[in-house]
Design a protein with these regions (language model features):
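Contiguous C-terminal substrate-recognition/catalytic subdomains in enzyme active sites
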Residues: 261-262, 271-324, 332
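Short Ser/Thr-interspersed hydrophobic loop/turn segments at strand-loop and sheet-helix junctions
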Residues: 287, 324-342, 351-352, 362-366
Length: 366
């Protein structure tokens, strides 16, 4: 225990004492009178100080409330980085999630833990195992997803969240309030009180509900029907593979509307670049995202893909990633859109752009 506090200024309250009966040891040592021992007196004081610190940090509390520090791995010194990787592997990406691992998931049974954090841990894939552990053993009984303007400093911090967990069970209903869907300048304290009383943007979920979602993410606003869809259906990732398309680095040279070139110079049925070469055609159908449209369409452009064009594209732009998937059947969507998600059929013989990520049937992918 004494060695643990050698880095107390660095690790702070992330230290979890190895001693189990701190209180008993303290009482025993405090009863000792070593004032007459020249060499023992100072050591006795240091041991008592370390044990008192250990007592403060032992997992004995029924309620823990914390606004932990926000620091990603890049901001940690080597000693601290090594410590959190060893002690808190699920939360090592940020100090705030290390504190969640340390205090939020190890306090007394039926204890409560309340935190103010950023919301990155709710959605990023790097926190998937942390979420799984938290949701499997605890109930989030209350959460306010604040978003911008969550601290008195104003709009400095984005995506804040405050939540309370209860240990032992993950089947208790929790109340979630959405405050992040408004402009950054809106005062969140008054909005919270308004939505709390009106029950607008207020949702109920159990922690167990989120365990059915990909990577155990926490989109608490999803409807019961949407949650059921995730629970009862096969994920697209199990039957298809989503790939990023190409960037030409010079769209004016390599991309045209199909109406701008001769139809006789477009090959619609290519299965490989060799087919393009044999056809003596320069252009192939090209999926480039486009406006909101469901199921079919937005196949208005063609791409220059002759052998000469292929050599140039192999060395500029993003250098033809996913080229082994070109000309295969699939479905694509627009990467950046202000509208709802929409998916469209990509026929065989087409090449997809980076603006149109494409899902391909795993069985057809060689």
């Amino acid at each position: 225990t004494l060695r643990q506090f050698e880095e107390a200024d660095n690790f702070g309250s992330l230290i979890r004492p190895d001693v189990t009966d701190v209180d008993g040891m303290l009482k025993n040592l405090e009863s000792k009178n070593v004032s007459g021992h020249l060499f023992l007196s100072e050591t006795h004081k240091k041991v008592l100080q370390a044990l008192r610190q250990a007592d403060y940090l032992s997992p004995k509390y029924h309620v823990v409330i914390a606004n932990p520090p926000y620091m990603g791995g890049k901001g940690m010194n080597p000693t601290l980085s090594d410590y959190v990787k060893r002690k808190f592997p699920l939360g090592k990406a940020d100090l705030m999630t290390c504190f969640m691992s340390s205090w939020g998931m190890s306090n007394n049974k039926n204890g409560l833990a309340a935190f103010v954090t950023l919301d990155s841990w709710m959605f990023l894939s790097s926190y998937a195992k942390l979420r799984q552990s938290l949701l499997s053993r605890n109930s989030i009984i209350s959460m306010a997803h604040i978003g911008w303007n969550c601290f008195p400093e104003g709009h400095t911090y984005n995506r804040g969240v405050t939540f309370i967990t209860k240990s032992l069970s993950n089947s208790d209903q929790g109340i979630f309030i959405q405050l992040s869907d408004v402009p950054a300048t809106v005062e969140k304290d008054s909005l919270f009180l308004e939505r709390k009383s009106s029950k607008d943007c207020r949702y109920t979920k159990t922690s167990r509900d989120f365990l059915d979602l990909p990577d155990y993410i926490l989109p608490f606003w999803l409807s019961a029907q949407m949650m059921s869809a995730f629970r009862e259906n096969i994920p697209i990732s199990e039957v298809s593979e989503i790939r990023v398309g190409l960037d030409t680095g010079d769209n004016e040279r390599f991309i045209r509307f199909a109406s701008e070139v001769s139809r006789n110079n477009i090959i619609f049925s290519a299965k490989s670049k060799e087919n393009v070469e044999k056809s003596c055609c320069r252009w192939v159908p090209h999926a480039k995202g486009g406006e909101y449209r469901k199921w079919y369409g937005n196949l208005l452009e063609v791409l220059a893909f002759s052998p000469a064009d292929y050599r140039v594209l192999s060395n500029q732009g993003n250098k033809l990633p996913s080229r082994q998937y070109y000309f295969k059947e699939g479905f694509f969507y627009t990467r950046v859109s202000s509208s709802k998600a929409s998916f469209r059929y990509l026929p065989c013989g087409s090449i997809f752009n980076s603006a149109a990520p494409t899902a391909l049937d795993r069985k057809s992918v060689v």
